[in-house]
Amino acid sequence: MIIDAHAHLWNPQAGRVNGKPVIPLTGGRSDFGGELRQMMPPYMLDGRNTVEMLMANMDYARVSGCVITQEYIDGSQDSYLLECKEKYPDRMRITCLYEEKPIADEWMSRFDGVKICGGRLENQDLLAHEEVFAQAERLGKFVAIDMADGDLQTDAMEELIGRHPDLRIAVGHFGMVTVDGWEKQIALAKHKNVYIESGGITWLFHREFYPYPSAVRAIRTAIDICGIDKLMWGSDYPRTMTAITYDMSKDFVEKTTELSDEEKRKFLGENAEKFYGFPKLAVPDKMINMVE
């Protein structure tokens, strides 16, 4: 069973970057704060990034479950994600978006976790946001956080982990693996309830491109730091699909000889099943494609 620990959905996209709006266009493009960007594959024509499209990709790639995280650049997708979870209650785990203001207990309780965009916070001191960490711990929710580059926030995170030992934390973007100091983010997973997910790793190594040998070496380094049991695969769908297919975002792991079969099973699904509390999910059938 494979689980994608880092994917995005939006309907519609209505975020901001550097104080400027992000506006969906046609052909998978967006006005990204005044710059034209290919936000997702061009066949996603109408600017919507829907759960039906994601599930079709997951089925073809034989991915059983997914975790939907959020980003300021997409705008809050809380309401849409609740709709998605109603359609796919077993296959999805969803987060509400922390926007540096209080979240009502009743609202957070409707989600599986809360997303904190650590590197995009107006106040970058994580200790100033302790209330949301404490709230998630109290309500039994996980925190998904993409931290600022390198070790800029690791000391504060260590402090928060110590204060809230029962809080489950998933650190995203594989610790911003191509930035000096990334190993300190990985080392946070030495704590019992802290895990690392690799959403965006193909973006971070995009200049090298498939089959991403440096990404595989980074996974091996992370195993040496915190152990394979704390690492989870994530695709960062759909933005990474502007360069590769959804299946390619994981099959470089499946095909490498640098990881054992047991390490692959844990990284691609078993660890996420445990961390996010997924039930035993069916594995989508293999579909023969037109070039096989």
Language-model-detected regions and their locations in the chain:
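Mid-to-C-terminal alpha-helical segments outside catalytic/metal-binding sites
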Residues: 1-5, 12-60, 65, 220-221, ...
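Hydrophobic faces of well-ordered beta-strands that scaffold small-molecule active sites
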Residues: 3-7, 66-69, 92-96, 112-116, ...
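Active-site beta-loop-alpha junctions enriched in small/polar residues
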Residues: 8, 71, 97-101, 117-119, ...
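A metal-dependent hydrolase metal-coordination microenvironment
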Residues: 46-103
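Generic structural signal for well-ordered alpha-helices
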Residues: 51-55, 78-85, 104-105, 133, ...
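Substrate-binding cleft of extracellular glycoside hydrolase catalytic domains
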Residues: 93-109, 116-124
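Catalytic pocket-lining loop regions of alpha/beta-barrel enzymes
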Residues: 121-232, 274, 279-292
